[in-house]
């Protein structure tokens, strides 16, 4: 790593520690040329798969879009922000765990519904009604009946 003080290429690591609940490494370094010390932080680069839309188009995963849908479904529902953040993290972890470079949008929708079903049944029905394009009250009733099973 280049020294930020003298731009020399030779530095040594003096100390390393895990920070941010083990998701980051803090390294204390010293330049071998000028002896200045500095700190670096190392995190894993987590690449999300591309999304294959129902029309066949491919686009980058948009976390904001997913979060927006979840928040709309949970609007005015008694669910903590921490629970929502955990659900979002779980969905992203499951997507990365597929090991695929591309995933169908249906997979993301199903993962969101699975998490909403655990968080809040009303939010699940709200999301499912839009996601599955319910046409009439009968479809709502069928989905509610499946929830009760």
From Swiss-Prot:
Keywords assigned: ATP-binding, DNA-binding, Metal-binding, Nucleotide-binding, Repressor, Transcription, Transcription regulation, Zinc, Zinc-finger
All copies of domain ATP-cone, residue ranges: 49-139
GO annotation, biological process: negative regulation of DNA-templated transcription
ZnF region ranges: unnamed: 3-34
Positions in coiled-coil regions: none
Pfam families xref list: ATP-cone, Zn_ribbon_NrdR
Cofactor note: Binds 1 zinc ion.
GO molecular function: ATP binding; DNA binding; zinc ion binding
Known cofactor(s): Zn(2+)
Disulphide bridges: none
Function (record text): Negatively regulates transcription of bacterial ribonucleotide reductase nrd genes and operons by binding to NrdR-boxes.
Family designation: Belongs to the NrdR family.
NCBIfam families xrefs: transcriptional regulator NrdR
Protein name: Transcriptional repressor NrdR
């Amino acid at each position: 790593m280049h020294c930020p003080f003298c731009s020399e290429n030779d530095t040594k690591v003096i100390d390393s520690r895990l920070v941010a609940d083990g998701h980051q490494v803090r390294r204390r370094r010293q330049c071998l040329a000028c002896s200045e010390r500095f700190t670096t932080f190392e995190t894993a680069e987590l690449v999300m798969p591309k999304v294959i839309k129902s029309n066949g188009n491919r686009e980058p995963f948009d976390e904001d879009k997913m979060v927006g849908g979840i928040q709309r479904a949970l609007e005015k529902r008694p669910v903590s922000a921490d629970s929502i953040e955990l659900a979002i993290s779980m969905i992203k972890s499951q997507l990365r765990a597929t090991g695929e470079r591309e995933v169908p949008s249906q997979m993301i929708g199903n993962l969101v519904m699975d998490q909403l079903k655990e968080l809040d049944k009303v939010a699940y029905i709200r999301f499912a009604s839009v996601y599955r394009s319910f046409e009439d009250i009968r479809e709502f009733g069928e989905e509610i009946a499946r929830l009760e099973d």
